[in-house]
Amino acid sequence: MASSLTKFDTGHEDLIHDISYDFYGKRLVTCSSDQRIKVWEFIERPDASVWELNDAWKAHDASILKAIWARPEYGQVIASCSFDRQVKIWEEQTVEPRNSQKRWAERFRLVESRGAVLDIAFAPTQNSLRLATCSSDGIVRIYEALEPTNLAQWSQMEEFEISSANIHRPIDADSGYCIDWCPNRTAAPMMVVGLGKEIGARIFKHDGHNRWIPSEFLPGHTQEVHDISWAPSMARSYQLIATASKDNLVRIYKLTEQHLPLQQQQQQQQQRGRVPSSPAGTPTQSGAASKSYHIELIASFDDHKAEVWRVEWNITGTILSSSGDDGKLRLWTTGYDGKWRQMASITANTQVPSAS
């Protein structure tokens, strides 16, 4: 099947920080240092397929670092975050004309961050609309829409510090934190967090009692992790996490569940610096927090030869995309022998399959 690239001019007046497809791949949101968000729709025509502008508007008072879509069951909903320390929730108003700058209405602002909001991620959970935010103040905050059909009411449910050593670092917009939820069904929620200037990434697990516990560390990085992505498992017996790093490498980690004795699990948690306790002060074990994973670095690629800024899995977790300062989007997949390889390298004008 032939493949093609569709190039279009976004019309942004400054650097584009992020682009994001909706669940079906028919819509695209772009955000920029020009403080504007633009929503695009893919229109298929007999002569040519094009991306048409749905609307564009000034969304923040500083550079917008990320814009993402909520799952489609909650309607047409976008969240955006910025250097202005705010996260905003936007909802499409189909009664408003396209390109009227009124098509997308602001429903709520999350303003608890004391520094730039560097990353955001909607939780994969069903029956509740949750959003995690990651700020330069070193705190991950988790919010929930009190009524998913009414996006004007959100509440902060939980928060945790990224540093497991309780180090209070100065608020630095260049701290480089990033987050992603585990998209797979587990006993309790999990997420993976890029540790910024502490170098590396760590899994955090919910203990079932409103606490997030620092857990397994993803080793091997020599500089900051710019982006992180947890793969859908699609019935695999193991899980995969990919990282994009300032040290020019794309890494893929394999997580295999271990069944350790309870005492050994508690010892590991004590070594990490925090053990969840009940109100009586006794250690508790619940859900995913009681499970341990063996972490294995199974692939490391330096093909970008430059800083890597983004990694993302496809919906089945079988293809990984990465992009970096070399101006290329690279696609990675595994062969029958279980080894990961580059399957394509995409530039603005051409697609050149890699040599096998």
PLM regions with names:
Residues 312-355:
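Blade-level signature of beta-propeller repeat domains, shared across WD40, Kelch, NHL, RCC1
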Residues 37-42, 87-92, 120, 140-145, ...:
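WD40-repeat beta-propellers
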Residues 15, 24, 53, 63, ...:
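WD40/WD-repeat beta-propeller blade-loop signature
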Residues 225-264:
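Loop/turn-rich, solvent-exposed surfaces of beta-rich toroidal or solenoidal domains
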Residues 8-35:
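Beta-strand-rich domains and repeat architectures in extracellular enzymes and scaffolds
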Residues 19-26, 68-75, 121-128, 178-188, ...:
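Loop/turn segments within WD40 beta-propeller blades
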Residues 1-11, 46-61, 94-119, 147-182, ...:
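Inter-blade linker and blade-boundary elements of WD-repeat/beta-propeller domains
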Residues 31-34, 80-84, 133-137, 145, ...:
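Conserved strand-to-loop turn within each blade of WD40 beta-propeller repeats
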